[in-house]
Amino acid sequence: MDARQMKIKAAQAALGYVESGMRLGIGTGSTAEEFVRLLAEKVASGFQIQGVPTSERTARLCLELGVPLKSLDELPELDLTIDGADEVDGKLRLIKGGGGALLREKIVASASERMIVIADESKVVDVLGAFKLPIEVNQFGLTTTRLAIEKVAARLGLTGDIGLRASGDGPFMTDGGHLILDASFGRIPDAEALAAGLNAIPGVVEHGLFLGMASLAIIAGPEGARTLTAG
């Protein structure tokens, strides 16, 4: 079973948690896109949901495949969000944002009664941090914000490159018009302390640490899909 097949397995398992009539947050990324394709098949057969996308990319795919969408302002409270992750640990702490949609992903997840993460087994880690931590920042005062991030990291014993994400000939721009700094900290033993420190920096719009948000993870491997709960 290759990586895409595992993503499809996880998405299929997640679809079993979606009930007709739900207000559904729909995530961003390659695994979430497999979920959208499967969801579209159910919608075509008469399944009723109202979706709220976490990115313009997801919105385009949903519209292309016929998945009905609303804005979060129209549906400010959601029943369930299904989204992928770049890393997930045994306590269901996540690193997200590899696709650049971390701010909207976190807003949508926080508006949901429940968040289910779908991923293949390569995303499961003992300690977060092998994947670069995305940090969404305001364009104004970029250097000041980067220095502040470095100071927060240093206080926690974290070092590593903090690079500006690029796209083509310029910087990557989020759907909200912000920049992303990707921090290569390596192991992050105290994710809560790092999150608190980043939250206190004025130029940081949001970061990719999703802590205490997921209630279940569906992890697919060669033998099929399994579920993880916070341990």
Swiss-Prot record:
Reaction catalysed by this enzyme: aldehydo-D-ribose 5-phosphate = D-ribulose 5-phosphate
Residues the record marks as active site: E105
GO function term, MF aspect, one: ribose-5-phosphate isomerase activity
Pfam families: Rib_5-P_isom_A
InterPro entries per record: NagB/RpiA_transferase-like, Ribose-5P_isomerase, Ribose5P_isomerase_typA_subgr, Ribose5P_isomerase_type_A
Residues involved in substrate binding: T28, G29, S30, T31, D83, G84, A85, D86, K96, G97, G98, G99, K123
SUPFAM superfamilies tied to this protein: D-ribose-5-phosphate isomerase (RpiA), lid domain (SSF75445), NagB/RpiA/CoA transferase-like (SSF100950)
Pathway(s): Carbohydrate degradation; pentose phosphate pathway; D-ribose 5-phosphate from D-ribulose 5-phosphate (non-oxidative stage): step 1/1
Keyword terms: Isomerase
Family matches, as Gene3D superfamilies: 3.30.70.260, 3.40.50.1360
Listed PANTHER family: RIBOSE-5-PHOSPHATE ISOMERASE 3, CHLOROPLASTIC-RELATED
Quaternary assembly: Homodimer.
Reported function: Catalyzes the reversible conversion of ribose-5-phosphate to ribulose 5-phosphate.
Entry's family note: Belongs to the ribose 5-phosphate isomerase family.
Name the record gives this protein: Ribose-5-phosphate isomerase A
Organism for this UniProt entry: Sinorhizobium fredii (strain NBRC 101917 / NGR234)
Taxon lineage: Bacteria, Pseudomonadati, Pseudomonadota, Alphaproteobacteria, Hyphomicrobiales
